C-alpha cells in the first residue's frame, strides 16, 4: 500500500476542506502517488481521481417537531423541570415587564390628556405599590376614577346652583319683608 500523506495534504489545501472529506480513487493509487505538486493534484481533481465528499447532513426535522410539540405545551410537566420557578422565569423580570407596560400606558394617557398630572402621579404610585395586576385593571381603575370625578363635579355644580338659588330667594324674601315693614310704618 502506497502512502498518500503528501497528496492528501495538498488535495485538502487545494479543495479547501479537511483530509477526512477527501476521496482518493483506490484503483488509481499508483497514479495519485506520482502527483507531488498542487498543479498535478488539480489535474487529478479535474480527471475525477480526487474528490471532495459532500458533508453529512445533520437533519433538524426531529428537533423542529420537538419544538413544535413544546410550543403546544408538551414535555413541560413537573418531571421535565430542573430549576425552581423563579430560576425558570424570575419574578423580578415579570415585575419589570408589568411595570414597563403600566408606565407606558400612563405616559400615553397623560400625553393624550386623558388624565392630568395629578391623576398620573396617583396611578403611577398605585402601580408601583402593586395595586394593578395588569393593564386591563389599570384602564378600568382610570375609567372609574374619571367617572367619579365627573360625578363629584356634577354634584358640586348642583350644590353651587342650589346655594345660589337659596341665596337669591333669601335676598328676595328679605327685600319683601323690608317693603312690608315700610308699608306698615
Curated annotation (Swiss-Prot):
Any Pfam family the entry gives: Ribosomal_L19e_C
Domain of life of the native organism: Eukaryota
GO biological process terms held by the UniProt record: translation
Keyword Ribonucleoprotein: yes
SMART domains the UniProt entry points to: Ribosomal_L19e (SM01416)
Signal peptide (residue range): none
Region (Disordered): 152-185
GO molecular function ontology, one term from the record: structural constituent of ribosome
InterPro entries assigned: 60S_ribosomal_eL19_sf, Ribosomal_eL19, Ribosomal_eL19_dom, Ribosomal_eL19_dom1, Ribosomal_eL19_euk
This protein's UniProt keywords: Ribonucleoprotein, Ribosomal protein
CDD domains: Ribosomal_L19e_E
GO cellular component: cytosolic large ribosomal subunit
Family the UniProt entry places it in: Belongs to the eukaryotic ribosomal protein eL19 family.
Alphabetized NCBIfam families for the sequence: PRK08570.1 (NF006343)
Descriptive protein name: Large ribosomal subunit protein eL19
Organism: Tetrahymena thermophila (strain SB210)
Phylogenetic placement of the source organism: Eukaryota, Sar, Alveolata, Ciliophora, Intramacronucleata
